[in-house]
A protein has these predicted regions:
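A structural signal for short loop-to-beta-strand junctions that line the ligand-binding cleft
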Residues: 1-22, 38, 50
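Extracellular/periplasmic catalytic domains that process cell-envelope and extracellular macromolecules
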Residues: 5-7, 13-17, 42-44, 102-103, ...
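Short beta-strand->loop
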Residues: 12, 38-41, 125-149, 158-160, ...
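Small-molecule pocket liners
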Residues: 18-21, 134, 152-155
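Short helix-loop capping/hinge motifs at secondary-structure junctions, enriched
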Residues: 27-35, 67-76, 161-167
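Ligand-binding pocket segment of bilobal, Venus flytrap-like solute-binding proteins
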Residues: 50, 54, 58-61, 65-139
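Mature extracytoplasmic/periplasmic domains
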Residues: 153-205
């Protein structure tokens, strides 16, 4: 597990990575129309964007990412301008945003990448239809740009744990090749262990 996926004092480390990506309507948004997260603030998308509530940790994470990249003044303007483009009041989870695009309420949203996989391979045929109507855009991918914002799922051992040895074995297993591949195959998350390649489905995105 690389240093950038660990806490400075090694009290926790990442087990998997989830990209916060743009999801767009397959037919209404052309390839190349949106390539950067900053472009969600463009007034041409007024009434086109859906979102879950800004108070959710996923959106707090992307806001922190933009703040770090642009600085406070520009980040605040970006947030206000993007909110002005909302098609409706923020509501629901990430899956609900894909459903809203499918149903024509909006054309663009932000989701964690693994929700797309969950919908694409859902046992519910209706949810598979939602996934079929959209595609993912990994933002800020141009040379020299910062790339998509990534959240992690992580693990650590509680200070007063009575089972530290067993807990350590569990965490070690979760970073093993077998477990890291399961993160991708079952939950469509990217491995934190750099020795493990993402699965074919993740690579195809």
């Amino acid at each position: 597990i690389p240093n950038y996926l660990r806490s400075p004092d090694n009290t926790w480390f990442g087990l998997s990575k989830r990209a916060r990506v743009i999801v767009v309507h397959n037919e209404k948004i052309a390839d190349g129309d949106i390539t950067r997260i900053e472009e969600l603030a463009d007034p041409k998308w007024k009434g086109k964007i859906c979102s879950r509530p800004g108070s959710h940790v996923y959106n707090r994470g992307i806001m922190a990412s933009v703040l770090a990249a642009l600085g406070e003044e520009k980040a605040e303007k970006w947030a206000k301008d993007m909110v002005a483009n909302f098609a409706k009041r923020p509501q629901g989870n990430d899956r609900a945003q894909v459903k809203a695009i499918h149903e024509g309420e909006c054309e663009i949203a932000l989701i964690n990448n693994y929700y797309f996989g969950k919908l694409k391979f859902s046992e519910d045929p209706e949810q598979r239809k939602w996934a079929e109507s959209v595609r993912l855009v990994f933002p800020n991918q141009a040379e020299g740009d910062r790339g998509a914002h990534v959240n992690i799922s992580g693990g650590g051992i509680a200070k007063f744990s009575k089972n530290k040895e067993e807990a350590q074995k569990l965490l070690e297993f979760l970073t093993s090749e077998k477990a890291q591949k399961l993160y991708g195959e079952i939950n469509f998350e990217y491995p934190a262990n750099l020795k493990i390649e993402p699965g074919d489905e993740l690579k195809s995105w």
